Amino acid sequence: MKAVYIIGTDTDVGKTLICAGLCWALKEKGYNIGYFKPVLSGAKRRGKMLIPQDTEFVVNFAKIKGDIYRLTPFIFEKPASPHIAASDENVDINVNQIKQTFEDLSQNYEFVIIEGCGGLAVPLKEERNQFYMQYQLIKEICNNVILVTTTKLGTINHTLLTVEFAKAYGLCLKGIIVNMYKNEPDEDKVINTITKFTNIPILAKVDFINDFPSDVDENKFKNVFKKCFDDRAIRKIMGVFEC
């Protein structure tokens, strides 16, 4: 089994959409793909049930087999940093449980895409005034990272800071996916600037989908992913799994 951890430069850069697209595109190419999101905050209620909506979307869109509550073992309603949401609900985010769940899931797939909760420096838990951070979990279960960014104002700073943080803490950041791409003149200038500073390959540029997540038109999504995750992009992405 091989895996890659999808992380973002910021909240709302579209990690879930990218994970769904990657899972779907790779399955279309015949790869046995699994999905895992260890921690999710900001879950929505449906009746009495708390739904990990990111996981539900990826599983339904990419037709991945698995119980959403197993694929996301820690779910919190409060839209906050996991260590705060967990503390408010008196829940211990058990890292060993996450590791074991990942190991169990890995037995069923050739490749697993792991979706992070926010960015690298997100605290997952606090115990005796000590923080356990997302980058620590990444290093322990899959030190193989793809960074999702955008071209919006401020993204150069966010992206470069994330890359430098990854280097400082020994993370294997293998590529960048640019999401919400609109093919506007300055966007490629932003992307070129990021590439010159980081020397990290751009794996794909994914077109902006203006009605996500309010209106899930699967055919529209699939057309975008067919274009953006073409054979060339897929070859680059599969190379990332080779850690």
UniProtKB/Swiss-Prot annotation:
Protein purpose: Catalyzes a mechanistically unusual reaction, the ATP-dependent insertion of CO2 between the N7 and N8 nitrogen atoms of 7,8-diaminopelargonic acid (DAPA, also called 7,8-diammoniononanoate) to form a ureido ring.
Source organism, top-level taxon: Bacteria
GO terms for MF: ATP binding; dethiobiotin synthase activity; magnesium ion binding
EC number(s) from the headed UniProt entry: 6.3.3.3
Amino acids binding Mg(2+): T16, D54, E115
SUPFAM superfamilies: P-loop containing nucleoside triphosphate hydrolases
Keyword presence, Metal-binding: yes
Assembly: Homodimer.
Binding site for ATP: D12, V13, G14, K15, T16, L17, D54, E115, G116, C117, G118, N179, M180
CDD domains xrefs: DTBS
UniProt keyword terms in alphabetical order: ATP-binding, Biotin biosynthesis, Cytoplasm, Ligase, Magnesium, Metal-binding, Nucleotide-binding
Substrates-to-products reaction catalysed: (7R,8S)-7,8-diammoniononanoate + CO2 + ATP = (4R,5S)-dethiobiotin + ADP + phosphate + 3 H(+)
Protein name: ATP-dependent dethiobiotin synthetase BioD
Xref: Pfam families: AAA_26
Signal sequence residues: none
Family named by the database record: Belongs to the dethiobiotin synthetase family.
InterPro entries given in the database record: DTB_synth_BioD, P-loop_NTPase
Binding site for substrate: S41
